[in-house]
Design a protein with these regions (language model features):
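Immediate N-terminus of the mature polypeptide
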Residues: 23-455, 459-511, 515-608
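Bacterial N-terminal signal peptides that target proteins for export
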Residues: 1-9
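Bacterial N-terminal signal peptides
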Residues: 8-18
Length: 608
């Protein structure tokens, strides 16, 4: 065995630069940790800035690889590429891991076999990584690889801020000493908001000064902060005031929490009129930060057939749960066609009150999970709002409980969502919540029932700016349901090319597959000033198959819809959005009254 003295050095890690704009201040490593460029080693800073200058001057790419999103990547082997492969020690017998440079014995630490440390919560992955080097020859290049692999193991173990040092030492005995310094919080800094809001955001972080930084805890706090649609918070790590400490920077962008909107949709039905006028407002901090309300009024243009009001409160609770309360009131008037006679003028009323209580769950980086519990009260004397043509002599009342699980997963190529909901009605709570009343409103239905639905969605980025979106919903039930609880299909949000909720059933599914073109800018083509827009075209295929549990003698076994079509999505700045879809029915639909020429679906909203 050769006796050697090791010169101190530290490991290098893979980093990527989110944008090569001259104002860029941070880099993001392969685990999603954003770090100030000033905190990088000098050689990595030089590579970043050299690549910036090369791109901005048009002289080529520079020393770092840059992808199509403008991310800069440092080759993980680059830092050790120039280090010697000469064998310093034939056989690595042991590794000693200590928390402070002062704990390193310059004369070496003979007699150690395997891995030695006195950390109370030493990550298992780090131990496995170090064990993989035991028994192998030692060189400067292999030691650099060990340092980088240890850093990687710490980060995949939920320790995002760690320094691994290899101080000068004697390794003649075959034992190498590593210094592992886990970052402890020095302070939380907030950028982008005024002083009063800074304190609120700082209080939402559960980590305290002097505590070690754990990515799962930090991610949970960040998910909570970003739950508000009026706020976007990015977290950045920076060196703290003292050795071994780290600052957390909450870089925050907020939007106006109060805005109102006007809109138009042709999402109605033939009986109630297809045109819909929308007016509403959102007041995100009506009762303080993250305590907001929203209101929407929906009607036909003449305010004759449909008048719908909905009010929603959403607010975070001090113990990190989320409360949503929805209330709606709808009145409808329609002329029901009667064969061989004049139409019959009827009116109906629908009332709903639905609180929801959501509990966020612990989840790894890139995931958001929560469970939700709720209750629904619904009162109705018609099914006109749900695509039917019936007004009843009595009013039905629904009292049902719900429970759900929701997960959103963000990965390197897109976003996936799954939403599972279950509903239970015990029945017989009031005179209008009885089997007799339910059977009168819907033959074969009872006031006690169970049903569940599952919604899934995947948004997938494709090469060259293309993208794909797949979504769908399915439902199962133990019996016939009232119209408000059935799954419906037809219209812009399920199967295009058909009237809204042209079919409905107790069970079944609908699904949609869309392919989007790369975005283009009309503003750039027309050379508009100070405005941004994005236009995408799409092609789609939609399908639905629905059925009832206890069918009447004249009901089909199932009803099916299929359509293909084209559409577009246009966003102009932050204030106008337009959707257009033309769907063409295909196949044998087994549904009466279908326009085989298809249907154009329009929706436009202007925000102020």
């Amino acid at each position: 065995m050769r006796g050697r003295k090791l010169i101190a050095f530290t490991g290098a890690i893979l980093v990527c630069l989110g944008s090569y704009a001259s104002a860029q201040q941070t880099v993001t490593d392969q685990y999603g940790t954003e770090i100030l460029i000033d905190a990088l080693p000098p050689d990595q800073q030089a590579q970043v800035f050299e690549t910036q200058m090369s791109l901005e001057s048009g002289q080529g790419q520079g020393p770092l690889r840059v992808n199509t999103d403008g991310q800069f990547f440092l080759d993980p082997g680059m830092a050790s590429g120039g280090l010697s492969e000469e064998i310093l020690v034939d056989y690595l017998r042991g590794v000693v891991v200590v928390p402070r440079p002062g704990d390193v014995r310059a004369e070496g630490w003979p007699g150690i076999e395997g891995i030695w440390h006195d950390f109370p919560d030493f990550p298992e992955k780090v131990g496995d990584t170090l064990n993989s080097f035991i028994g192998t020859p030692v060189s400067l290049a292999s030691l650099d690889l060990m340092v980088r692999e240890v850093i990687k193991a710490y980060r995949t173990s939920g320790r995002p801020v760690v320094d691994v040092l290899l101080p000068e030492q004697d390794i003649t005995s075959g034992v190498v000493q590593l210094v592992v310094i886990e970052g402890e919080l020095s302070r939380i800094r907030v950028e982008g908001v005024d002083a009063s809001y800074e304190d609120y955001l700082r209080r939402q972080m559960t980590i305290k000064k002097g505590e070690p930084i754990r990515s799962n805890d930090i991610q949970r706090d960040l998910n909570w902060l970003n739950r508000s649609p009026y706020r976007k918070v990015d977290l950045i790590y920076a060196p703290g005031l003292n050795f071994g400490t780290t600052d957390i920077i909450l870089r925050t962008v907020t939007s106006n929490p109060f805005w109102y909107y006007l809109g138009y949709e042709n999402s109605g039905t033939e009986l109630l009129g297809e045109d819909r006028f929308l007016f509403g407002f959102n007041w995100g901090d009506a009762f303080g930060p993250d305590q907001g309300i929203s209101y929407q009024f929906t009607s036909d243009f003449e305010f004759d057939t449909v008048r719908a009001h909905s009010l929603v409160f959403q607010g975070g609770l001090p113990w990190r749960h989320w409360l949503t309360i929805l209330g709606s009131y709808v009145t409808v008037d329609a002329e029901i066609p009667v064969e061989g006679a004049d139409p019959v003028l009827v009116g109906g009323r629908n009332l709903q009150f639905s609180p929801r209580y959501a509990i966020p769950l612990n989840a790894p980086a890139g995931q958001v999970r929560e469970i939700e519990f709720g209750f629904d009260y619904k009162s109705s004397n018609n099914d006109l709002e749900f695509g039917g043509q019936s007004v009843f002599d009595t009013t039905t009342e629904i009292f049902q409980f719900s429970a759900g699980y929701d997960i959103t997963v963000t990965d390197g190529t897109g976003i996936s969502r799954v939403d599972l909901q279950g509903f239970y009605s015990p029945g017989e709570w009031t005179n209008q919540n009885s089997d007799a009343v339910f059977d009168q409103a819907r033959a074969g239905s009872s006031s006690d029932y169970l049903y569940a639905n599952l919604g899934v969605e995947r948004q997938q980025r494709l090469p060259e700016g293309w993208s794909l979106r797949a979504r769908g919903q399915g439902q199962i039930s133990n019996g016939n349901l009232q119209a408000s609880e059935q799954i419906g299909a037809g219209g812009y949000d399920t199967v295009r090319g058909y009237e809204q909720r042209v079919i409905r059933g107790d069970e079944g599914f609908w699904g949609s597959l869309e392919v989007y073109t790369p975005p283009i800018s009309l503003g750039r083509i027309a050379q508009w000033e100070n405005e941004t827009d994005e236009l995408r075209f799409l092609a789609f295929y939609d399908q639905a198959i629905l059925t009832n549990v206890d069918r009447l003698p004249d009901e089909p076994n199932q009803q099916e819809l299929q359509s293909v079509g084209l559409g577009l999505r246009w966003r102009y700045s932050d204030w106008f959005r337009l959707r257009l879809d033309y769907g063409l029915p295909v196949g044998d639909n087994n549904v009466d009254g279908i326009d085989t020429n298809g249907r154009l679906h329009i929706g436009a909203t202007a925000n102020f």
